[in-house]
Amino acid sequence: MIQIFFLGTGAGSPSKKRKLPAFLVRREGLNILLDCGEGTQYTLMNNKLGINSIKIIGITHMHGDHVFGLLGVIASMGLLDRKETLYILGPRDLKDFLYTSFEYSKFNPSFKIEFIDNYNDQNITIATFKTCHTVESQGYLISERDRVKIDEEKLEKEKIKDWRVMRKLKEGKTVEYNGKFLKPEDYLVIKRGLKVAYTGDTIPCQSVIESVKGVDLLIHDSTFLNEPSAFTYGHSNVADAAKVALEASVKLLALTHISPRYEDVTEHLKVARRIFPKSILPDDLSYITLK
């Protein structure tokens, strides 16, 4: 199970309805923050989302609406006496930006900060992919590892209830049971891991489409409803995001990075759903659960 909290779904500058980009991804105790617009620490604390429980932060690019909240989050972690290592992924300039800011603000973190290119553990991987913006930018693909499960329905049908048999089958061993040899490949099924992709700011481009194919959730730049010059600014219109979702055969599309010029987003959803019916436009502080 993966939960995604939409902490900030706006763009450029905050509006009354939408704060700046930030998304919290939770998976069985692992908390990942994607982008960190100004005010993210307040949103995390005010909604009891555990600022010090964040293990990994991924920044898509160095524009202020995506990164200006990072210093505050890290400073608050220090004030809360964090000891655990914080892992950060991001563009090449991010490390210099942070440590220069630490130097001028006389801040010395009480914990280790490690800059990484990707993340792997026994349950999940985080990879980056190239996006197409006006500055160096990258998206994030969070993938659960596939899991092997016992076909309980088949075992029940064959009246096999011995837990020792089940354990050996799951270990990939052939088991003799009531005069019959049970092969693991006949009783094991692969449960496909969930996948979540976040583009940050981007125009629709092939590198994004190829990287997000088949994901369970695509969070895609949808800055404008129908702005002819969207590509000039390195952003997508709603229809662009929907076409990417359609071509990449994703399961669900979340429109985000909504320009503050729009108070009513009813038309955004109508446009998206005409192209890709499984589209949503989350409000700030909404969340979804993938299973």
Curated annotation (Swiss-Prot):
For this UniProt record, the keywords arranged alphabetically read as follows: Endonuclease, Hydrolase, Metal-binding, Nuclease, tRNA processing, Zinc
For the ligand (Zn(2+) 2), the binding residues are D65, H66, D201, H257
What positions does the entry give for Zn(2+) 1 binding? H61, H63, H133, D201
Reactions listed under catalytic activity: Endonucleolytic cleavage of RNA, removing extra 3' nucleotides from tRNA precursor, generating 3' termini of tRNAs. A 3'-hydroxy group is left at the tRNA terminus and a 5'-phosphoryl group is left at the trailer molecule
Q: Which GO terms describe its molecular function?
A: 3'-tRNA processing endoribonuclease activity; zinc ion binding
Gene3D superfamilies named in the record: Ribonuclease Z/Hydroxyacylglutathione hydrolase-like (3.60.15.10)
Q: Where is the active site?
A: D65 (proton acceptor)
Q: Which domain of life is it from?
A: Archaea
Q: Does the keyword Signal apply?
A: no
Q: How is the cofactor bound?
A: Binds 2 Zn(2+) ions.
Enzyme Commission designation: 3.1.26.11
Identify which cofactors the protein needs according to its UniProt entry: Zn(2+)
EC main group: hydrolase
Pfam families under this entry? Lactamase_B (PF00753), Lactamase_B_2 (PF12706)
Quaternary structure annotation from Swiss-Prot or TrEMBL: Homodimer.
HAMAP family listed in its UniProt record: RNase_Z_BN
What this protein is reported to do is described as: Zinc phosphodiesterase, which displays some tRNA 3'-processing endonuclease activity. Probably involved in tRNA maturation, by removing a 3'-trailer from precursor tRNA.
Name by which UniProt lists this protein: Ribonuclease Z
Organism name = Saccharolobus islandicus (strain Y.G.57.14 / Yellowstone #1)
Q: What is the lineage of its organism?
A: Archaea, Thermoproteota, Thermoprotei, Sulfolobales, Sulfolobaceae
This protein's gene is called: rnz
